[in-house]
Curated annotation (Swiss-Prot):
It holds the Pfam family MutS_I. ATP binds at G616, P617, N618, M619, A620, G621, K622, S623. The gene is mutS. This is DNA mismatch repair protein MutS. GO terms for biological process: mismatch repair.
Amino acid sequence: MAKVVETPLMKQYFDIKAKHPDAILLFRVGDFYEMYGEDAVIGAEILGIVQTKRANGVGQHVEMAGFPHHALDSYLPKLVRAGKRVAICDQLEDPKLTKKLVKRGITELVTPGVSINDNILNHKENNFLASIHFAKEVCGISFLDISTGEFMTAEGSIDYIDKLLNNFSPKEVLIERGNKKRFEEAFGPRFFIFELDDWIFTTSAAEDRLLKHFETKNLKGFGVQHLKLGIIASGAILYYLDQTQHTHISHITALSRIEEDRYVRLDKFTVRSLELVGTMNDEGTSLLDVIDKTISPMGSRMLRRWILFPLKDVKPIQERQEVVDYFFREPETKELLDTQLEQIGDLERIISKVAVGRVSPREVVQLKVALRAIEPIKEACMASGEPSLCRIGEQLNACALIRDRIEKEINNDPPSLVNKGGIIAKGVNEELDDLRAIAYSGKDYLLKVQQREIELTGIPSLKIAFNNVFGYYIEVRNTHKDKVPANWIRKQTLVNAERYITEELKEYEEKILGAEEKILALETRLFNELVLALTEYIPPIQMNANLIGRIDCLLSFAKAAEANKYIRPVVSDSDKIDIKGGRHPVIEKQLPLGEPYIANDVYLDDEKQQIIIITGPNMAGKSALLRQTALITLMAQIGCFVPAESAHIGIVDKIFTRVGASDNISVGESTFMVEMNEASDILNNMTSRSLVLFDELGRGTSTYDGISIAWAIVEYIHEHPNAKAKTLFATHYHELNEMERAFKRIKNYNVSVKEVGNKVIFLRKLIPGGSEHSFGIHVAKMAGMPKSIVKRSNEILKQLESENRQEGITGKPVKAIASAAEGYQLSFFQLDDPVLSQVRDEIKNLDVNNLTPLEALNKLIEIKRIITGK
């Protein structure tokens, strides 16, 4: 882009652009927002608008693209969703009042993580900005949703921070400059990151910002004073808000600690494989989709967080259950609350807009409607007699004074923009009423003048009109221009008519136009005074929004339970999971009409049945059974009713899944490496209160490697002295059925099938005992495999089975392992073979507890070389 002698406008543009080189600059010129240079090229492509050129000095030009200023709300979201930071540069003075270049400046910097624009935000999700501060072994992290005022912090291991990033899904992450590689190594490349200077991430700078914002002497009142790394991350967020011109943030009233010990640990693999809030394909259905019957945006956002952060304490779970139970017993109350919740709207985000000074007149009216609806909700809660609902009712505040003031001062159906006028109600301000009388009676006055002049001049076609060039005028056709009085002043000659002005019209014009300007200024002032008064009500209205969200979530649970025939589970501190007639909440909703879901029982405890090995053919329903057990457990621990005939859930502290293939090929990891990494994470972090799901572990390697690893992992879980994790282990390795004989808390089950001739019918029923057949060839046939391949597969299978029987392979080595199992040792390492003896010694000397996944893989390769001699 050539640049020699710039025009004053372009010089002003480049000066402002230099301060925000990493943002697309929307530069206000008259009624348009314009982009220049590279911004124009990028913006035109994203927005699908025409790219053109603007003159920039003699013989120079610059690329340009733009759109009308009133279309900002349509185009801005497209830029932000494309991952762009957008600097909005407005005219800071009225062009009519200056003969020089209009002053311009940045009024807002919108980024993916910092926005209050409704067209950018998803009302069902939070829009979090995150900040991370790295130390040697741990990190501090902070999350802020400027659209709701929620501000949270935590610190912990890389693994814990990764879990939080996955669950909160921030739209933007702030990091120290130069830490991009470290961040991506720890958390992957999936986040939009922005680098800030190192000095911003210092203790003193961060504490100063936080104390200044909250106007406190220390942070003890927030319970975060010991989270030094979290405080640094939080301070960086406040700095970033200041840099992006978001300085009015009185709605950020607290910094809360994310309490790790309150919630069940769900890693990103578990959240993804259980499809809790999202699906693996566009056509899928998540758990959230099934149980989300919320009405308010606050309820939708809260339910999403409840699902991702199940509770570990029995008491708050039971309190939620009691409310859901109450709604079942009192359908009239449920109906009343439903009706009132529909009136609430996005109370949380509206009051945040009040704080930042971006609330519209219509949103203020919606605020009034919401506060009016809170009164009957409060009364219903207080009258319920249910302790949790009564506590909610006590805290709800209808804010009657400000509600009544809005009712009195704002028209019921105002325009969305202040500058459109017609906002302030009649009778609020005497001066405003007088000005309106002048401005709005103008039409009648002009009609009277027009009729009078027709009668005086005898010109029947005479008419009075207005344009922006010379204001009010009288138009007379040429056939009557000889009748025009001498005191009329001619202003314009048309083909068929002449236009005139009079002193009377000019005086009236000044009066009426002056009145309109004064009306707009006065309405704007009165509206801003009301908004300022509203800022005093931010804390109670934020509390209302939170409580409404809670009621909405619990109502949603009741509606989902009623619609889907869920029951109330017993939740306790026991060590058992006892599910009778359990169903998969998502799959049962996808079955064809009239087809029943085959329910199954699952029982796990620490004494008799800690581990269930599930065998059965592919497509029989093993994976669904694993997932439904985890989902029922999770639903119980968020206070929801569950799809079962009965359920007793002993609290779990962590849910682990190794379900399905999840190759991370993009970073060079194979299926097997991913399996081993995930399995290692489970084995190193499980406790006696954990629920562990393994589905087809070992598929990424050879059969005997797979069997060996699967056996060793199951044995390790069974024999671990301090972590008897309740485990469901689905496998196609039927050899693992032998483990039941050697380990008292391992039990075999299979998902039953029925053979009819050459066909297989999947019964999908879990029954005791192992399965000896995989029916893989039957599944291939069902999948439409060519008949010749199916036939040849059967021939090869029979040949292999015959050879194995002749050589005595089938079952014998595995049974030998089971019968001689001792401690952690696998019995086939006790055979009289010098090579296997060497392997046994290698494994004996391993420090399993301190072995990293990579070291384990290298050791496996070394053992393979010993066995194969290669």
